Amino acid sequence: SLVCDLECSAEVTTCCETGTCHGITTYNCVGGTEPET
């Protein structure tokens, strides 16, 4: 799995559940992992 560094959105809900969404004007999901496909 790859480390997530993605914009927090509905498309990366799985990532955000296992990572940390943070930011002020830009929200990134950091510290989670990309779901295996």
Swiss-Prot record:
Keywords: Disulfide bond, Ion channel impairing toxin, Knottin, Neurotoxin, Secreted, Toxin. It is found in: Secreted. One of its GO terms (cellular component) is extracellular region. One of its GO terms (molecular function) is toxin activity. Expressed by the venom duct. Disulfide bonds join 4-16, 8-21, 15-29. The cysteine framework is VI/VII (C-C-CC-C-C). The presence of a 'disulfide through disulfide knot' structurally defines this protein as a knottin. Acts as a neurotoxin by inhibiting an ion channel. This is Turripeptide Lol6.2. It comes from Iotyrris olangoensis.
